[in-house]
Curated annotation (Swiss-Prot):
The keyword ATP-binding applies. Residues 87-105, 123-138, 346-356, 369-382 have a biased composition (Low complexity). The keyword Secreted does not apply. Changing Y177F: Abolishes interaction with FES and GRB2. Keywords: Acetylation, ATP-binding, Cell projection, Chromosomal rearrangement, Coiled coil, GTPase activation, Guanine-nucleotide releasing factor, Kinase, Methylation, Nucleotide-binding, Phosphoprotein, Proto-oncogene, Serine/threonine-protein kinase, Synapse, Transferase. Residues 1054-1248 form the Rho-GAP domain. It is an enzyme of class 2 (transferase). It comes from Homo sapiens. Residues 197-385 are annotated as: Binding to ABL SH2-domain. This is Breakpoint cluster region protein.
């Protein structure tokens, strides 16, 4: 059973007074049946509404005619102030209208109209003799500004005033029936059988003369004039305040349609000025035959005219220039007389201009809501104008037409069934071309049509969705998905105009596509020619694979373009193009072959690029022709981009046909051909997508919920022993592994899919399945440390360049080098395996540096797997489109490198973080528990410390302190584990850890909060478990300084010569004791000297050595070996002067920088032997110990380089007086750079001595002195 999710809630929100209907939707078939019933119900109800509206308007009009009680204010009349000649005149107000008064009530007074600037208020503007009273300013002087308004504009002003913004006149009369008369020379002469003033009559005479001049000009003008730009603001040819488009008969086809078309379709020569009747009567209420036409030849008798009364269209756009020609709307057709429910159905097919109810079918104009009225702009593309239906077929009417580039062209009107009927465009903009692909109504239009559309992969449409730019939502509904059987002639005309625009868009798109195919073919011919030579770039087989079916596709579309281009150029509405689309659809089999080969072609192209630098250069620089308007005649494209073009093209084939069919009348000869082409295209896409309906369900996790991205990050994949950087995306139904393609200048990111696994097929491998899996190749620590040193050095160079204000080229070069080194470090450092297994038998291994991240990925995948129930497979097209979408969906936009950080981002903390892990609560049962600590360093997380295991408890109290070195760190993570001594207790995932992760959490290291160097307590919550911590931070500028000795007793902080003299020994006792204990039981301890010891144990040992406690050896035997190693490091760190002394430290730094190996060895050995005796012997003793530790590297993972990294700064770091650090610690970048330089030097000095095979002993004389003399 299909659950209509959200339907009831949405229904109640929309219709709170009614209960939602019950729908039994058990299958897709039930949904389709319910949809058909809904459509049928809407058609029936719309038919009934149209019929009732027909009857209502007829009765309203009949009642108005009988009572002669039209609202005068609605028709623009006010009680005018007495003119000098005493005549009563109609005048217009430009102010906001008030609601119509009730019957018998006097309307409120009116203000005098004010002159308004261009483009303000009513589009019609004030017109001499019509829109202004004679006494208004400058009303009599308008003759010098241009010809007076046309009669059509004069009459349409009444409607403008009705919808204007004026206040009713002070002494306006009650509404009454209006009848006006005009003479062919004198213009308006009577209103309700009362003569008008001489001034009105003279202005009317001027208007009639102007009409005749324009008619003669229009009959003889060239078609080319129609290409003039649409009127904006005040006309350059006429300053009378009337829309220039309406003044020019040729420029404005709407003027022709509204005013020059006879309702009876009889023969009528255009603009015959000498055959007018002396007087004509205008029936305002019912719009008699002469209405809306201006002075025309009347070949019918009065009785014939009365037989065909028409109800005019209503002008709903009070702020549009295009309303200037709009006719009169009687009160009966106003939306104000409809209830809200009636207005909801005012978008039906009946909403059109209609002839008399006794002769023609009734139509009503489209409705707009008041809010839409208020927002209608001068560019409104919905100019409603009254139109009669027929004209003589020999009277050519030229219309302005918008193409996709906004150029006005000319075209002939489509004659319907040979009757020469003119079909008015109710929506298409003639004054302003509608936007090509305008999105104003696009979403609404797509929603209306989605029921009829087949499933297409979600990709942007290449075909235009043409819709009027300023069209209101009520206009948009008329072109809805439910095609009414009563399609009006106006809709037919609109569709045919749209059809030309759609075809123009297809033609432009086809031209671009051909240029891309040409760019693909361009290198193919020379490559084929070179394949037969002794030095081929590619083999013939490789060329055939990469460019498979590209020549055939080019020929198919070249033939299609060559056939379509002349037909669009010689356009008429009778033009047929359906055969071209039908033939194109019949050749889609070539695309089938191309799509099937696409994945192989891409893989082959990538391999060839890697193997052949010449081909790689060619594939990245393919030139395709640009648009004519582009500055550069060609654009650079990669081979991968161009090979995807046909795949993208074929997925959009049905969208183009849908648009074309939507605007092709069913009676047009092209309609069946286009339908056949659409059917072929739909079947083709369905066959490619392999039973597309089940896949759509599998591609959604829940009903109505589409695939979404849950998590993504950069990870290292182990492929045949090699490390590869990948960007991994976790979607709601699959795991996708991609490779970030190399980017050339200015190009956007692109991804290449390596593999994917549906979540229903994914599992995590167990250790039993991994017996044959090889060990993970680990990178030696010294290599990683060397990379870190290089990175620090490059960062220092970048800062030096910035401070020196040198050119950006050097800085950019260094930044590029830094990015390469950081990327290499990120690639080489992870060593923790994260393996996923597919049901088809394939396994994939990722390397992660943090168990926290590994656990997070597992949790997210397992949580999502609970919602996935069905396996599926993606076609190459779907996979490519999904991969392309990753660019927009990704949340991690760049590799986590410090070079990618913004300048204003925090550089992180450098120094030492002391962490005390106190206790944890929230465990449900007693277990053996321990915690580990991770911090981020150089863009990735590493494990830094581990507590002891607290056995058999649900509330462990560790109270252990750790000192963690921070290198640009921003986050501290803690993970809590249950130690599993029974190996079979839990599955050994990844063949790595046998311990169970109980919880994980993290805390941000805020520099502001940690700067006071005081202990701060915090609680980290994780899965119901709470761990209590205390943290304290010592920044690098403080930790680098050695404090001078303030005491002469004890061991720590006392000069080494003083200690050895007091102890009468060559090497301090603390050094000998710690080394002996470590060599006894710590040589195979993983990470010895690198893993932090428990701080409390270290402090206890420190106190014992300081007071010369005789039980110190007993204490050491009971303590963790890492605490003993920590105590030894602490002793050397707290020496008031480094073991290599402040005096010789600069010399050691200079000696290690020598390039000549012989000179370096001589210098370094001489410096070493120049150290004070206690320092030298202690160092040699320690050096031998460290070399023995490194011999166990295979077990303890401590190489010579690792040991040098740990002890270098400890043994050589200068004291405060010799530190090269700046005195001002408020410069973190400078401090960090100085530290990096010193650390590099210190590590290299110690590493040099560790790597020397033998260090010569001091000479015998000195030896005897050193070992015999008591100090």
């Amino acid at each position: 059973m299909v659950d209509p999710v959200g339907f009831a809630e949405a229904w109640k929100a929309q219709f709170p007074d009614s209960e939602p209907p019950r729908m039994e939707l058990r299958s897709v078939g039930d949904i389709e049946q319910e949809l058909e019933r809904c459509k049928a119900s809407i058609r029936r109800l719309e038919q009934e509404v149209n019929q009732e509206r027909f009857r209502m308007i007829y009765l309203q009009t009949l009642l108005a005619k009988e009572k002669k009680s039209y609202d005068r204010q609605r028709w623009g009349f006010r009680r005018a102030a007495q003119a000098p000649d005493g005549a009563s005149e109609p005048r217009a107000s430009a102010s906001r209208p008030q609601p119509a008064p009730a019957d018998g009530a006097d309307p409120p007074p009116a203000e005098e109209p004010e002159a308004r600037p261009d483009g303000e208020g009513s589009p019609g503007k004030a017109r001499p003799g019509t829109a202004r009273r004679p006494g208004a300013a400058a009303s009599g002087e308008r003759d010098d500004r241009g010809p007076p308004a046309s009669v059509a504009a004069l009459r349409s002003n009444f409607e403008r005033i009705r919808k204007g913004h004026g206040q009713p006149g002070a002494d306006a009369e009650k509404p009454f029936y209006v009848n006006v008369e005009f003479h062919h020379e004198r213009g308006l002469v009577k209103v309700n059988d009362k003569e008008v003033s001489d001034r009105i009559s003279s202005l009317g005479s001027q208007a009639m003369q102007m009409e005749r001049k324009k008619s003669q000009h229009g009959a003889g003008s060239s078609v080319g004039d129609a290409s003039r730009p649409p009127y904006r603001g005040r006309s350059s040819e006429s300053s009378c305040g009337v829309d220039g488009d309406y003044e020019d008969a040729e420029l404005n086809p709407r003027f022709l349609k509204d005013n020059l078309i006879d309702a009876n379709g009889g023969s009528r020569p255009p603009w015959p000025p000498l055959e007018y009747q002396p007087y004509q009567s205008i029936y305002v209420g019912g719009m008699m035959e002469g209405e809306g036409k201006g002075p025309l030849l009347r070949s019918q008798s009065t009785s014939e005219q009365e037989k065909r009364l028409t109800w005019p269209r209503r002008s709903y756009s009070p702020r549009s220039f295009e309303d200037c020609g709009g006719g009169y709307t009687p009160d009966c057709s106003s939306n104000e007389n409809l209830t809200s429910s009636e207005e909801d159905f005012s978008s039906g097919q009946s909403s059109r201009v209609s002839p008399s109810p006794t002769t023609y079918r009734m139509f009503r104009d489209k409705s707009r809501s008041p809010s839409q009225n208020s927002q209608q702009s001068f560019d409104s593309s919905s100019p409603p104008t009254p139109q009669c239906h027929k004209r003589h077929r020999h009277c050519p009417v030229v219309v302005s037409e918008a193409t996709i580039v906004g150029v006005r062209k000319t075209g002939q009107i489509w004659p319907n069934d040979g009757e020469g009927a003119f079909h008015g465009d109710a929506d298409g903009s003639f004054g302003t071309p509608p936007g090509y692909g305008c999105a104003a109504d696009r979403a609404e239009e797509q929603r209306r049509h989605q029921d009829g559309l087949p499933y297409i992969d979600d990709s942007p449409s290449s075909s235009p969705h043409l819709s009027s730019k300023g069209r209101g939502s009520r206009d948009a509904l008329v072109s809805g998905a439910l095609e009414s059987t009563k399609a009006s002639e106006l809709d037919l005309e609109k569709g045919l105009e749209m059809r030309k625009w759609v075809l123009s868009g297809i033609l432009a798109s086809e031209e671009t596509y051909l240029s891309h195919l040409e760019a693909l073919l361009l290198p193919m011919k020379p490559l084929k020619a070179a394949a037969t030579t002794s030095q081929p770039v590619l083999t013939s087989q490789q060329i055939e694979t990469i460019f498979f079916k590209v020549p055939e596709l080019y020929e198919i579309h070249k033939e299609f373009y060559d056939g379509l281009f002349p037909r669009v150029q010689q356009w008429s509405h009778q033009q047929r193009v359906g055969d071209l689309f039908q033939k194109l659809a019949s050749q889609l089999g070539v695309y089938r072959a191309f799509v099937d080969n696409y994945g192989v072609a891409m893989e082959m192209a990538e391999k060839c690029c890697q193997a052949n630098a010449q081909f790689a250069e060619i594939s990245e620089n393919l030139r395709a022709r640009s648009n004519k308007d582009a500055k550069d005649p060609t654009t650079k494209n990669s081979l991968e981009t161009l090979l995807y073009k046909p795949v993208d093209r074929v997925t959009r084939s049905t969208l183009v046909l849908h648009d074309l069919l939507k605007h092709t009348p069913a009676s047009h000869p092209d309609h069946p051909l286009l339908q056949d082409a659409l059917r072929i295209s739909q079947n083709f896409l369905s066959s490619i997508n392999e039973e597309i309906t089940p896949r759509r369900q599998s591609m959604t996790v829940k009903k109505g919920e589409h695939r979404q991205l849950l998590k993504d990050s950069f990870m290292v994949e182990l492929v045949e022993g090699a490390r590869k950087l990948r960007h991994v995306f976790l979607f709601t139904d699959l795991l996708l592994c991609t490779k970030l393609k190399k980017q050339s200048g200015g190009k956007t990111q692109q991804y290449d899919c390596k593999w994917y696994i549906p979540l229903t097929d994914l599992s995590f491998q167990m250790v039993d399945e991994l017996e044959a899996v090889p060990n993970i190749p680990l990178v030696p620590d010294e290599e990683l440390d060397a990379l870190k040193i290089k990175i620090s050095q490059i960062k220092n160079d970048i800062q030096r360049e910035k401070r020196a204000n040198k050119g950006s080229k050097a800085t950019e070069r260094l930044k590029k080098k830094l990015s390469e080194q950081e990327s290499l470090l990120l690639l080489m450092s992870p060593s923790m395996a994260f393996r996923v297994h597919s049901r088809n038998g394939k396994s994939y291994t990722f390397l992660i540096s943090s168990d926290y991240e590994r656990a997070e990925w597992r949790e997210n995948i397992r949580e999502q797997q609970k919602k996935c129930f069905r396996s599926f497979s993606l076609t190459s097209v779907e996979l490519q489109m999904l991969t392309n979408s990753c660019v927009k969906l990704q949340t991690v936009h760049s590799i986590p490198l410090t070079i990618n950080k913004e300048d204003d981002e925090s550089p992180g903390l450098y120094g030492f973080l002391n962490v005390i892990v106190h206790s944890a609560t929230g465990f449900k049962q007693s277990s053996n528990l321990y915690c580990t600590l991770e911090v981020d360093s150089f863009g990735y997380f590493v494990n830094k410390a581990k507590t002891r295991v607290y056995r058999d408890t649900a509330e462990p109290n560790w109270n252990e302190e750790f000192e963690i070195e921070l290198e640009g760190s921003q986050t501290l993570r803690i993970l809590c584990y249950e130690k599993c001594y029974n190996k079979t207790k839990i599955p050994k995932e990844d063949g790595e850890s046998t311990d169970r992760l109980m919880g994980k959490g993290q805390v941000q290291l805020d520099p502001q909060a940690l700067q006071d160097r005081d202990w701060q307590r915090t609680v980290i919550a994780m899965n119901g478990i709470e761990v209590k911590l205390s943290v304290k931070f010592n920044s690098r500028e403080f930790s680098l300084k050695r404090m001078p000795s303030r005491k002469q007793t004890g061991v720590f902080g006392v000069k080494i010569a003083v200690v050895t003299k007091r102890e009468r020994s060559k090497v301090p006792y603390i050094v000998r004791q710690c080394v002996e204990e470590i060599e006894r039981r710590g040589m195979e301890e993983v990470g010895i000297y690198r893993v932090s010891g428990v701080a409390t144990d270290i402090q206890a040992l420190k106190a014992a050595f300081d007071v010369n406690n005789k039980d110190v050896s007993v204490m050491m035997s009971e303590m963790d070996v890492n605490a003993i190693a920590g105590t030894l490091k602490l002793y050397f760190r707290e020496l008031p002067e480094p073991l290599f002394t402040d005096e010789f430290y600069p010399n050691f730094a200079e000696g290690i920088a020598l390039s000549d190996p012989v000179a370096k060895e001589s210098c370094m050995l001489n410096l070493l032997l120049s150290l004070p005796e206690a320092n030298l012997l202690t160092f040699l003793f320690l050096l031998d110990h460290l070399k023995r530790v490194a011999e166990k590297e295979a077990v303890n993972k401590m190489s010579l380089h690792n040991l040098a990294t740990v002890f270098g700064p400890t043994l050589l770091r200068p004291s405060e007086k010799e530190s090269k650090l700046p005195a001002n610690p408020s410069q973190p970048i400078t401090m960090t750079d100085s530290w990096s330089l010193e650390v590099m030097s210190q590590v290299q000095v110690l590493l040099y001595f560790l790597q020397l095979e033998a260090i010569p002993a001091p000479d015998s004389k000195r030896q005897s002195i050193l070992f015999s003399t008591e100090v």
